[in-house]
């Protein structure tokens, strides 16, 4: 009996060590990273990789939200410290709307999401959260009034004036330099993602790890912030188990 208790204790220590320093599991609850990550994807995050190397452009990272370190976000690194980011106006004839494309160091960064576009809301309420493996829910809800999404893709006053190299006629920064030790991140679903365009850069110390594989995926219903709690997180897991997406299980997450 004593041997079994010791073995169980060692297993618990090993699991805690792995989760703290090597890998942790998360569930994707929002569409901000579509089509790369879907609602109901269960991912593993490598927490050791950035102890051995620096984050690179294209890496899909989990990080502590700079405005509230208790919140975890997942986004893709678009630019690193020293990079120059510029937004170019582009008229989308298909959707009859002006959008902005992004270039890093003069090279156009292509975003391929073709899903539903949300271009015009008087009040755009954005919800984003990550579910940790233990069922804890990290969530928030932000309402941007009047200014957000009038020009999709635009940077909305997130960049300080000393870093901005160019403003457009509306006073929004459209060209800037990322400071050393910081990262500019965006969601793959550009027009439905709260990211560096709205709240600025991610400090190096906020980065927790790199997403590297979808270990399970299942179709689940979406949740409102009011519905999100540990009980509904368990319910989402049950839904996912009953409605698997076999083609996504075990899918590696390739850097762009």
From Swiss-Prot:
Keywords: Hydrolase, Protease
Single GO BP term: signal peptide processing
Main enzyme class: hydrolase
EC number(s) from the headed UniProt entry: 3.4.21.89
Catalysed reaction, written as an equation: Cleavage of hydrophobic, N-terminal signal or leader sequences from secreted and periplasmic proteins
Entries under InterPro entries matching the protein: LexA/Signal_pep-like_sf, Pept_S26A_signal_pept_1, Pept_S26A_signal_pept_1_CS, Pept_S26A_signal_pept_1_Lys-AS, Pept_S26A_signal_pept_1_Ser-AS, Peptidase_S26
The keyword Heme is annotated on this UniProt entry: no
Residues annotated as catalytic: 32, 75
Pfam families (UniProt xref): Peptidase_S26 (PF10502)
Gene3D superfamilies attached to this UniProt entry: Umud Fragment, subunit A (2.10.109.10)
One Gene Ontology MF term: serine-type endopeptidase activity
Cellular compartments per GO CC: membrane
Family: Belongs to the peptidase S26 family.
Protein name in the entry: Signal peptidase I
Organism: Aquifex aeolicus (strain VF5)
């Amino acid at each position: 009996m004593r041997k079994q208790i010791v073995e169980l204790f060692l297993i618990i220590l090993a699991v805690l060590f792995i989760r703290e320093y090597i890998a942790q599991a998360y569930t994707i609850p929002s569409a901000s990273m579509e089509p790369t990550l879907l609602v109901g994807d269960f991912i593993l995050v490598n927490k050791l990789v950035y102890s051995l190397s620096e984050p690179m452009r294209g890496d899909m990272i989990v990080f502590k939200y700079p405005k509230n370190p208790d919140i975890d976000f997942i986004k893709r690194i678009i630019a690193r410290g020293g990079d120059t980011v510029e937004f170019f106006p582009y008229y989308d004839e298909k959707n009859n709307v002006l959008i902005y494309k992004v270039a890093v160091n003069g090279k156009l960064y292509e975003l391929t999401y073709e899903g539903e576009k949300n271009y015009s809301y008087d009040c755009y309420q954005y919800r984003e959260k990550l579910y940790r493996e233990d069922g804890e829910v990290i969530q928030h809800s932000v309402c941007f009034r009047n200014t957000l999404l009038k020009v999709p893709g635009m940077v909305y006053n997130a960049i300080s004036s000393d870093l901005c190299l160019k403003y457009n006629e509306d006073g929004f920064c459209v060209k800037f330099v990322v400071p050393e030790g910081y990262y500019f991140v965006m969601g793959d679903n550009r027009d439905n993602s709260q990211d560096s365009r709205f709240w600025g850069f991610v400090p190096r110390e906020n980065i927790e790890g790199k997403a590297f594989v979808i270990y399970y995926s299942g179709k689940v219903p979406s949740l409102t912030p009011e519905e999100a709690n540990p009980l509904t997180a368990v319910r989402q897991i049950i839904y996912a188990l009953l409605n698997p997406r076999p083609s996504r299980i075990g899918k590696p997450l390739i850097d762009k």
